[in-house]
Amino acid sequence: MIAMGSPKAGNHNDLYEIEEVLKEILAFLEEAGIEHKGLFLNADAGFDSQGVREYLEGKDIVANIRENPRNRGERDNYFDEKLYERRFIIERTNAWIDGQKALLVRYEKLDVNWVTLHLLAFSLFFLRKIKV
């Protein structure tokens, strides 16, 4: 997990304003000096949209998105099951975040405070992982 978008209301589906979120994430990576070309995006079936796939392809990002059974048809999309198994790392991180009471429920009124708490949590998670 190298970047995140700003918080969105919980009453929308995963694809709500997804291109704006992706633009925000790519701008964050660019500002940090991280090259995004050639990276891959592992996403679950909730993000299975031809628009998302085309947007990522236009940015030279590999879309490794599990197909949503409701969207099946004549599509021939790339999907690497082995690569997708690494998504467990993201799910484990999300579960760890859910275990932190201050992060589980959004008490902050300002988006910047919510984002800052999450960045602090990610830093703590990273430091624990490298055992500093």
What residue ranges belong to the model's regions?
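Charged phosphate-binding loop/patch that engages nucleotide di/tri-phosphates or the phosphate backbone
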Residues: L117-V132
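Residue-level marker of positions within ordered structural domains that often coincide
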Residues: K23, A102, F125
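Helix-centered, glycine/charged polyanion-binding patches within enzymatic domains
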Residues: E30, E35-F40, A45-L110
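Short, glycine/serine-rich, charged loops/turns that create anion-binding
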Residues: A9, G46, L124
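Electropositive, glycine- and tryptophan-enriched low-complexity nucleic-acid-binding patches
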Residues: M1-G33
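Catalytic-loop motifs flanking and including active-site residues across diverse enzymes
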Residues: D14-E17, I89, T116-L119
